[in-house]
């Protein structure tokens, strides 16, 4: 099997792309590194395609290894034929390989095996030959042997039938046909063990659906209902058609003596041996597909959660709500440092609302708190009421956000949290985590087991190893997509960086604590156990602000520094210009469209294009000296200018792409590929850009809405909290997420909600119905 050619066909990419990617993987390169820094080799395959390629590569290599093991085993038994070898070599799945190996596989003791030990195989072959003319009992009498346990002709015939049944069951072609027919015509049936019992599985109490049509989330629901002993689930196959097919294959001659025997043997082979195995195989395959689908959805939801836009530059009050033990508070400054913690008791049974408000007002004034980050757990509803009342009483603007606190309690009780906050109790750690989730979701959520974050479906029922690996890959891709500040990143964040293990991550933090801030990327090579290969893999994802080299603050890889510097020289850009641009980009809230009032370089005209970018505005300021003319050119081409002296030269800054006439030629001159050149240009044009800025910011609230206030037709704005196969759950600010069924998401037909929405999206919804008793809210995203 040409694995690379097969991968190219499956993924619909060029074989050369597969060849290059497989080589890079085999050389020990990580997926994030290949996706970001080996685009020329792979043809710019993204991390999702690369992950799929890697997964299939591992499967197909394991398949080839298993084929060789099977072939060796059959050859050792001296039973290999050219036809069998070809079938094994051509097999595309493990199931087919195992079906072909079944007749030759060493078996545990079976009825057929026992019959063979009793010497009944010749009788079985005699019956299969279908040429007996006399009484079968007379033929069978010759095999009576009390020492071997064959006490009668009937016992001999029964043993022979067991041997034939196993032969029928072991035939790979028969199994292939039966499996295919069952997939096409079989049904999944379920019934309640107790019809009168109320449960969440009521829709499955008398349920049936074709195997070929049943969707993943129903399979997972049926599996859970069966595991909880609420449902009985089975697969109903077209048994009549299957037995008829087997009879045609096995009964090849008209023989009134052997035909009835073979008919009953075929029925036994199917019902006792084949049907249970095929049902198990198909249900396992359905479950595997359902799990893969659910894991994929979980992964996409997790990615959206991790890539939420950070709320920076704000002092945040984290609020972990509770009843009896009180609400834990933590004030966190703009850098994530915890300034203060306390506990208030505004909820039952204490109900000390006035005291709680007094404490809150004092903290808000003392620490200039801008935002309250409220966890959505127990007592969240009651806490929100207090917050809303408080906001109305304040003399300064304060808003609040309800944050999904899933996993916060897991983190707060972890060894990591204990190391980070040794003097805090569990509740205080949780409050600090809830505040930080708002400031930098990615940095905070990486500290929590992804499975505990709660944006999936049936995650606790799945293959935990597969789920864990898939979610870890999502976190790894997200962290590397954003990059980390080498001087502030925690070990929890660093360990997800390409090429960095948990041990090396801790070593980086220890090196930083002992030697102070990193001033350049090369210093990473001084970290214990971080060698040249790890450095190659990680360096481009590590950022150093205000370091020796401004390129260290970009995603330009050190291996491309020489090319980047040559490019800057050709475009008349200095390192100081880049530094100035980075500083300007880092100033949050500054209007980058503001015209720089300084003068242009003497004797030159300064043309700043695309002044809405921080780069354009900053470099305009950075290059200004006395004399010359400043021309601010907006995206629409209109310009305004201010003379400062005569000039005969012109420096064009802003859209660097437009200044390059022949990119291919320039890339060759710089000794890099065109794609790498494009990436370097983007980094220079938009320094310090965070890809999370493209995501929607969370909804900041200052008032409260009650579920009883909801009326059909009411239009609201909400945040998508979870995406599942049959719809999306939207937080509309009433402490009970509403469900938008997949049929209500958009006017056009979609197979899955992810085609239209993602976790974290801000969406407009309309109330369809409200069920106060069951606490269910039905919403629609359709217009009108």
Task: Outline where the language-model segments fall.
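Short beta-alpha connecting loops at secondary-structure transitions
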Residues: 18, 341-348, 371, 413-426, ...
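Long, charge-rich intrinsically disordered scaffolds of nucleic-acid metabolism proteins
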Residues: 96, 401, 407, 412-482, ...
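Single-stranded RNA-binding regions, centering on S1/OB-family and related RNA-binding modules
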Residues: 552, 564-784
